[in-house]
Regions:
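C-terminus-biased signal that marks the final domain/tail of proteins
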Residues: 1-212
Length: 212
């Protein structure tokens, strides 16, 4: 679905030659960046590994068919993802050196991951730790789970149960990597009072956001 005359206008303005397939992200996207980010890539690659998707590709499929059944736990795990243990782990090489003494008094250097390195560092902290690495910098990645997330949810549909309880929204406030998920059933006509209070712009101890 697109605006009437879009292709004709794009061709008239020189954005499209009329010969190549009309790909919206190529014709209209003004930054020229790829039409996907590492978040899209990571989810699709995880669900369909045999496709051998890579970040070097020009574009990714809009969707993929999961190669295995996807459970509720799988979905929650993806929403908590920070790429820890993968090649995109931003903290894996943020090491610091500390001098320690052995039992015999011999001084030596020990290298360990900085206790300041974690998956939700501020930009300033990330740059500070990166500055200690010399020329070999770690690229900052946009993780799926982020501290500035307002909320996330997973919809589960269970057709073998009555509609009132078969449909459930697993709701999470704030960072999906740190907050629990609360079931909100399709048959509910009301929610707890704390879910009716907005706590995004101010501190409200009676808001579910600040509880979680």
């Amino acid at each position: 679905m697109y605006s009437e005359g879009l292709k004709e206008k794009a061709r008239k303005l020189g954005y499209w030659d009329g010969k190549e397939p009309f790909k919206f992200w190529k014709v209209i996207h003004e930054t020229g960046k790829k039409p996907f980010t590492i978040r899209d890539f990571f989810v699709l690659k995880t669900l369909a590994p045999s496709l051998n998707l890579t970040m070097d590709m020009e574009e990714l499929p809009l969707s993929v068919k999961p190669e295995q059944n996807v459970s509720l736990a799988d979905m929650n795990r993806l929403l908590r993802e920070t790429y820890e243990g993968t090649e995109w782990d931003m903290t894996k090489d943020m090491m610091v050196t500390k001098k320690i003494k052995d039992k015999d008094g011999t001084e030596r250097d020990t290298i360990y991951k900085s206790p300041l390195a974690q998956n939700w560092m501020t930009n300033d902290m990330f740059e500070f730790l990166n500055a200690q690495r010399g020329e070999k910098k770690i690229e900052k990645q946009r993780t799926i789970s982020v501290v500035w997330c307002a909320y996330s949810f997973v919809i589960q549909c269970r057709d073998w149960l009555p509609d009132e309880v078969g449909g459930v929204c697993w709701w999470s406030e704030d960072n999906p990597g740190e907050s629990p998920r609360v079931p909100l059933f399709a048959g509910m006509t009301d929610v707890p009072e704390s879910f009716k209070v907005c706590g995004h712009k101010r501190y409200r101890p009676d808001a579910a956001l600040w509880t979680y």
